[in-house]
C-alpha cells in the first residue's frame, strides 16, 4: 500500500512518521512535483492539480473539515480527480470539542454582558446592568452537521432554548429543527444568538446578508465559525452600526489574513480570532485516517465521505 502526503504548512516529517507507525504495512512518502509513481491513497490540503490528476486512487483524504478548496479546484480542473474516487474529510478528530469550547465561552460572554461591561470599562464607567433571562436567550445553529450537533450538545448543559436550521430536518433531543428555505425566516425570528456552522457551497455563499440579518430579533449576536464567504461583511457592519446586531465574534473572513485596513478590526462590537476555532489535531487525524483506510481495505462501509454534488 502506497500513501502520498501533501500539506503546504504541516510538519510533513511528523505526519509521515506517525502514519508509518499507525499503518505499518504502508509505504508513506511526501509528494513533490514530478512524482508520478503509483499510490493508493492521497492525504492532501490545497493539493496541486498534478498531484492527483491521472492517478488510480482508492481514496483521497482532505486534511480538514472543509472541502470547499479542493471542490472549487475540481470545478476548474475536472481532470484532477476521477469522479469514482471517494473523497473524505475530517468530520471531527477533536474539532467538535474545540468548537464546543469556542461557542460556549462566547455565548456565556454575551449572556453575562461582558461585552457591555468592557465598553463601560473603556470609559471608566461603573454601572451594573440588568441581567438577561435564559428563556429569552434562544440560540440558533445555522447548519446541522457533525460540528453543529456537537455545539448543540454542549449548549444544552446551560439550558438555553436551542434551534437548528439545515437542508433536511433533524431529530436532536431538546433542539427545535427547521428545514429548507421556506422555514428559514421562522428559524431566525427568535435567534438571540446565531451560530454559523454551514458548509461552504454555492447555495450558502453570502447567505448572511442584509435580508437575513433583518429577520433576527433586534440586538442579536452573530458567531461565525464556518467560512468567511458566508457573510457579506458590509451588510454585517451596517447591522452593527444600526444596533440591529449587537455584537459579532468572527473566526473566518472573506480574505485571510484579514487586511489591516478592514473596518472589522476596530469596530467596538466585533471580536476577531485568526481562523483558530477548530484546528486539525494531528494525532486524532492520523487515528481516524488509519482506521478508515483499514475499513476501506476490508470493504466495509465508512463515514465521512463527501457528496461532491452537495459540497460536503
Swiss-Prot record:
The active site is at residues 227, 275. It is found in: Cytoplasm. GO terms for molecular function: glyoxylate reductase (NADPH) activity; hydroxypyruvate reductase (NADH) activity; hydroxypyruvate reductase (NADPH) activity; NAD binding. Pfam families: 2-Hacid_dh_C. One of its GO terms (cellular component) is cytosol. Keywords: Cytoplasm, NAD, NADP, Oxidoreductase. It catalyses: glycolate + NADP(+) = glyoxylate + NADPH + H(+); (R)-glycerate + NAD(+) = 3-hydroxypyruvate + NADH + H(+); (R)-glycerate + NADP(+) = 3-hydroxypyruvate + NADPH + H(+). Catalyzes the NADPH-dependent reduction of glyoxylate and hydroxypyruvate into glycolate and glycerate, respectively. Belongs to the D-isomer specific 2-hydroxyacid dehydrogenase family. GhrA subfamily. NCBIfam families: PRK15469.1. This is Glyoxylate/hydroxypyruvate reductase A. It comes from Escherichia coli O9:H4 (strain HS). The gene is ghrA.
Amino acid at each position: 500500500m502506497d500513501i502520498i502526503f501533501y500539506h503546504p504548512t504541516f510538519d510533513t516529517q511528523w505526519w509521515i512518521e506517525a502514519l508509518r507507525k499507525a499503518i505499518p504495512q504502508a509505504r508513506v512518502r511526501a509528494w513533490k512535483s514530478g512524482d508520478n509513481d503509483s499510490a493508493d491513497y492521497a492525504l492532501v490540503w490545497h493539493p496541486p492539480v498534478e498531484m492527483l490528476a491521472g492517478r488510480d486512487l482508492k481514496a483521497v483524504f482532505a486534511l480538514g473539515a472543509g472541502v470547499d478548496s479542493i471542490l472549487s479546484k475540481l470545478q476548474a480542473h475536472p481532470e484532477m480527480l476521477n469522479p469514482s474516487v471517494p473523497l473524505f474529510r475530517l468530520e471531527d478528530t477533536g474539532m467538535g470539542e474545540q468548537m464546543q469550547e469556542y461557542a460556549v465561552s462566547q455565548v456565556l460572554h454575551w449572556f453575562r454582558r461582558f461585552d457591555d461591561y468592557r465598553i463601560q470599562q473603556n470609559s471608566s464607567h461603573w454601572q451594573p446592568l440588568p441581567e438577561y433571562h435564559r428563556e429569552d436567550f434562544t440560540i440558533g445553529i445555522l447548519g446541522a452537521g457533525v460540528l453543529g450537533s456537537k455545539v448543540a450538545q454542549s449548549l444544552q448543559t446551560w439550558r438555553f432554548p436551542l434551534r437548528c436550521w439545515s437542508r433536511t430536518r433533524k431529530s436532536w433531543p431538546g433542539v427545535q429543527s427547521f428545514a429548507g428555505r421556506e422555514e428559514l425566516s421562522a428559524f431566525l425570528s427568535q435567534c438571540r444568538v446565531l451560530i454559523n456552522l454551514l458548509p461552504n457551497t454555492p447555495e450558502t455563499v453570502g447567505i448572511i446578508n442584509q435580508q437575513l440579518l433583518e429577520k433576527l430579533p433586534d440586538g442579536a449576536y452573530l458567531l461565525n465559525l464556518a467560512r468567511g464567504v458566508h457573510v457579506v461583511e458590509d451588510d454585517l457592519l451596517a447591522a452593527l452600526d444600526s444596533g440591529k446586531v449587537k455584537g459579532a465574534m468572527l473566526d473566518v473572513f472573506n480574505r485571510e489574513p484579514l487586511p489591516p485596513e478592514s473596518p472589522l478590526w476596530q469596530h467596538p462590537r466585533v471580536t476577531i480570532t485568526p481562523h483558530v476555532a477548530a484546528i486539525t489535531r494531528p494525532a486524532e487525524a492520523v487515528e481516524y485516517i488509519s482506521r478508515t483506510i483499514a475499513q476501506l481495505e476490508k470493504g466495509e462501509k465508512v463515514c465521512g465521505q463527501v457528496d461532491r454534488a452537495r459540497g460536503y
